Amino acid sequence: MFEARLLRSSILKKVLEAIKDLLTQATFDCDDNGIQLQAMDNSHVSLVSLTLRADGFDKYRCDRNISMGMNLGSMSKILIFAGDKDTATIKAQDNADNVTFVFESPNQEKVSDYEMKLMNLDLEHLGIPETEYSCTIRMPSSEFARICRDLSQFGESMVISCTKEGVKFSATGDIGSANVKLAQTASIDKEEEAVVIEMEEPVTLTFACQYLNYFTKATSLSPQVQLSMSADVPLVVEYRIPDIGHIRYYLAPKIEEEDS
């Protein structure tokens, strides 16, 4: 038997919002430690890694390891029926071919349940190597979302450059160019508004704006985002979900074509 209960269904809704533009289907791997999802996006350009720890749920029971393949479009249709303040419970029997979502209103006057067929997804598990990053940037997630949205109006690619002076985001296209520079905040009362840069050596890499904008769909999950960069390895964009886990996106840098 598998059962996981969240006091607020809004977390589940936000997690789905953060991945459904990249994935049409995914396997949720459940064990004693919690729920994990790891998958390449539909175009095999980026990788999504989600961890929801068992201790972050109001109730969590997993008698034996279970992998649940789900169509995220179908799951999205079901989650629409949950009020943001409803509790959400996910249940499945061992070796079941369906999963049940139960939503309860705060006063328990309304209880609704929805059953969804599970899918057999033969997806390979990708090992993510441990990497030491040359540059780590922590900044407000809403600011990062705004920069990605604004600069994508100028070009399809965005250059992220990290130096001891700060971090610079730039894009160039037919209408011109745009640059946004952020310096490390000297002191700030609210931690979530801080810009913190840890740098071993300067890094400048180019990424597809389209995917960065997909990643910022996770903005509502966390007030801060962390960007980790090193030359020639994928960028990691991490949103920590308070009290329960994190979602990480990996995106390989674009290789700049030499002018012929």
Swiss-Prot record:
It comes from Bombyx mori (Silk moth). Its main location: nucleus. Belongs to the PCNA family. CDD domains: PCNA. This protein is an auxiliary protein of DNA polymerase delta and is involved in the control of eukaryotic DNA replication by increasing the polymerase's processibility during elongation of the leading strand. One of its GO terms (biological process) is regulation of DNA replication. Keywords: DNA replication, DNA-binding, Nucleus. One of its GO terms (molecular function) is DNA binding. The gene is PCNA. This is Proliferating cell nuclear antigen. The lineage of its organism: Eukaryota, Metazoa, Ecdysozoa, Arthropoda, Hexapoda. Homotrimer. Forms a complex with activator 1 heteropentamer in the presence of ATP. It is found in: Nucleus. InterPro entries: DNA_clamp_sf, Pr_cel_nuc_antig, Pr_cel_nuc_antig_C, Pr_cel_nuc_antig_CS, Pr_cel_nuc_antig_N. GO terms for cellular component: PCNA complex. Residues 61-80 bind DNA.
